[in-house]
């Protein structure tokens, strides 16, 4: 039983460590996903969850996501924004 708890705890920790936070980035257009501060939170949350993140919100007119998989393209700064 203790082994099962330890394995579960390790898997949760690994998932947390490998998760990334950042602005959703469109590699093709080379820009971050635009939003309207405060009113764009629902769209950002939906787009972040679609990309595998835990949640998202609008920050500096771009969609900031928490808990994205490492394979999802992100930017650490809002930079140039574009519509999806």
From Swiss-Prot:
InterPro entries associated with the record: LCN-type_CS_alpha_beta_dom, Scorpion_toxin-like_sf, Scorpion_toxinL, Scorpion_toxinL/defensin
One example GO MF annotation: toxin activity
Matches recorded under Gene3D superfamilies: Knottin, scorpion toxin-like
Subcellular localization(s) per the UniProt record: Secreted
Disulfide bonds: 31-82, 35-58, 44-63, 48-65
GO cellular component assignments: extracellular region
Keywords: Cleavage on pair of basic residues, Disulfide bond, Ion channel impairing toxin, Neurotoxin, Secreted, Signal, Toxin, Voltage-gated sodium channel impairing toxin
A Pfam family hit: Toxin_3
Stored SUPFAM superfamilies: Scorpion toxin-like
Every LCN-type CS-alpha/beta domain range: 20-83
Entry comment describing in which tissues the protein is expressed: Expressed by the venom gland.
Signal peptide: 1-19
Family affiliation: Belongs to the long (4 C-C) scorpion toxin superfamily. Sodium channel inhibitor family. Beta subfamily.
Entry domain remark: Has the structural arrangement of an alpha-helix connected to antiparallel beta-sheets by disulfide bonds (CS-alpha/beta).
Record function comment: Beta toxins bind voltage-independently at site-4 of sodium channels (Nav) and shift the voltage of activation toward more negative potentials thereby affecting sodium channel activation and promoting spontaneous and repetitive firing. Has some action on peripheral ganglia, but not on other sodium channels such as those from cerebellum granular cells in culture. Induces sleep, suggesting a strong antiepileptic action.
Protein name stated in the entry: Toxin Cll9
Source species: Centruroides limpidus (Mexican scorpion)
Phylogenetic placement of the source organism: Eukaryota, Metazoa, Ecdysozoa, Arthropoda, Chelicerata
């Amino acid at each position: 039983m203790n082994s099962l708890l330890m394995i579960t705890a390790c898997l949760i920790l690994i998932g947390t460590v490998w998760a990334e936070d950042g602005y959703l980035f469109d590699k093709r257009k080379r820009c971050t996903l635009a939003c309207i501060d405060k009113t764009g939170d629902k769209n950002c949350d939906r787009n972040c969850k679609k990309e595998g993140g835990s949640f998202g919100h609008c920050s500096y007119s771009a969609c900031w996501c928490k808990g994205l998989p490492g394979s999802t393209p992100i930017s650490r700064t809002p930079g140039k924004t574009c519509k999806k």
